[in-house]
């Protein structure tokens, strides 16, 4: 059966009937091969031809305008790069290759007896644009298990980090050290053809994703479990299950939560700090280890990956001040006090979204199913009813609705993972699925070195005809 999405129908109309056969990510027969690299090798020439045709016809078309405020405002809303794996709609939220989170939850393969999608399936979708079969997902699970072992120098490095070194710093350093294993770096030094770049980027990306749970688990065990062993990878288990086992958690609900968490945090289009960083560094032909390590340094920033930690701190302070069973009016007063003191309510608002984040919604549904009476969840649910109205009354927020960070920490706390400093590491492991999928395609499509033009304030004033003051 051939599938055609709404966006792809629009693209087909734009290109005209004679070129519509090139819309391979929109109208296609699902691949039957279980080897992801083989599937990619078949797709890439068709996608290259599609983009070549599109650029030949529309390369000079103007797609927007840039204002002075955009330059000073972090380039918000500026259309400036191609990112294939996901698109963030202000009203609908994230779509992975055109599929919403509820659709992914329904369509992606599950573990035996499980209800949440396997991240392996999401990775296949991000790379190929196709919903994988159970056999294809099982192939990815086995492939990652086979590639998971860490080189001895990385193990030694992790075991000798000081305990006061932040978990994200440890993650970034360990990933950088894996650069010694890069097949792309070796192949590039040997002068491989540009048309082969993607093959080695693929191999490095698969290796890195496979090894990340081992790195992350060692960091956790060294910091919080007295350096106890992470154990061995079980090739019969999926990626998330192995990860939770290595962390030391065996609760089946927590394993399901990890599958959901690693799926929904994987990608959020290309303009966020971690995704853009990996894209930028990768454009210099740095290998995936270096590009991803750079992305993790961005994710470690408090304005990007530390938000769920800030939510928990705020919730904890709220409980200490008001107690666990608090009235709606007292909550309203507390929220107003937070806002009137010049602070924000953490976990609410988003740079792009203008509705409730669907990543929040699916975590809320998980909590309603598995921990409806948990005091911290009940507080989060109560805030969901109150905070948006207060923010609307205040009149400053463009988006008064909760984002993913308003909920994720609460779920981790419930299942016993209390170490808030570690949460961003989980975010990082998940984000690898998205940014490395795109990195493969960036090299397959021959994207050049990213080099935008910068301007000084004086130069900008001259450009717009303003008088210098």
UniProtKB/Swiss-Prot annotation:
Name of the protein in question: Citrate synthase, mitochondrial
InterPro entries documented for this protein: Citrate_synth-like_lrg_a-sub, Citrate_synth-like_sm_a-sub, Citrate_synthase, Citrate_synthase_AS, Citrate_synthase_euk, Citrate_synthase_sf
Top-rank taxon: Eukaryota
Subunit structure, as described in the record: Homodimer.
Record keywords: Mitochondrion, Transferase, Transit peptide, Tricarboxylic acid cycle
Entry annotation: catalytic residues: 304, 350, 405
Residues that hold oxaloacetate according to the record: 359, 431, 451
Source organism: Amblyrhynchus cristatus
GO molecular function: citrate (Si)-synthase activity; identical protein binding
Chain segment of the transit peptide: 1-31
Remaining remarks: Citrate synthase is found in nearly all cells capable of oxidative metabolism.
